[in-house]
């Protein structure tokens, strides 16, 4: 089999119909995912962006030199987007209550999907992303959207944007609305807004093909 898996369809018996082949691919990729994730220990890591030409550079990247960065951002908070990773990093945040077709998978259970979203952002868009799965349950064990809202608000000084992911309804809408009102960085809910964008794009293209206006 080609390591790129381009020939995956040819690995199944030729008498399989389309539905059988689809189920076979799903089973194959689930088994592969477990082995590959175990082998690599997840999909992402953090690597230094800046070089270290010599030992003395530690004095610039860390103390005492970095004090100028800290006070510079203190005096002008917008400098955080130029002097730190904030200008190119997104927090991918979930409480893991509605993960794909698996539902509530527990907070750490969502890490595979959040890592996957971070992986896509980096490979396809060149944007760094940090997967964060948090526990939004209150003392009674109920998922409280206010806990998630407060958590994300407190994270935003470290990130340039927030991508909300796999949060169950109706909490997802409440969380998105509250954070968009109160955060000073863009907040996006992939499952709601992403799906909406794709649906709208499909509708607009269909109207072009049909030669009709949206009002019709």
Where are the regions that the model predicts?
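Structural motif corresponding to the C-terminal cap of alpha-helices
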Residues: 77, 183, 203-210
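N-terminal ligand-binding/catalytic initiation module
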Residues: 2-185
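Short helix-loop-beta connector
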Residues: 212-216
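A glycine-rich, Thr/Ser-enriched phosphate-binding loop motif common to dinucleotide/cofactor-binding enzymes
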Residues: 188-205
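A composition-driven signal for long, intrinsically disordered, charge-rich low-complexity tracts
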Residues: 1-2, 199
């Amino acid at each position: 089999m080609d390591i790129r898996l381009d020939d995956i369809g040819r690995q199944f018996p030729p008498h399989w119909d389309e539905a059988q082949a689809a189920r076979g691919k799903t089973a194959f990729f689930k088994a592969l995912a477990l082995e590959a994730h175990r082998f690599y220990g997840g999909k992402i890591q953090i690597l230094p962006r800046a070089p270290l030409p010599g030992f003395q550079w530690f004095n610039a990247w860390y103390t005492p030199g970095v004090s100028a960065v800290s006070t510079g951002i203190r005096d002008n908070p917008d400098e955080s987007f130029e002097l730190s990773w904030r200008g190119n990093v997104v927090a991918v945040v979930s409480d893991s209550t509605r993960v794909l077709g698996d539902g509530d998978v527990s907070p750490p259970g969502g890490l595979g999907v959040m890592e996957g979203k971070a992986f896509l952002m980096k490979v396809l868009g060149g944007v760094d992303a940090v997967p964060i799965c948090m526990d939004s349950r209150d003392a009674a064990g109920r998922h409280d959207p206010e806990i998630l809202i407060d958590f994300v608000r407190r994270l935003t000084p470290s990130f340039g944007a927030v991508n909300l992911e796999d949060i169950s309804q109706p909490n997802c809408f409440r969380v998105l609305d509250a954070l968009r009102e109160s955060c000073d960085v863009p907040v996006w809910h992939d499952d709601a807004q992403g799906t909406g964008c794709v649906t709208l794009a499909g509708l607009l293209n269909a109207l072009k093909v049909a030669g009709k206006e949206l009002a019709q």
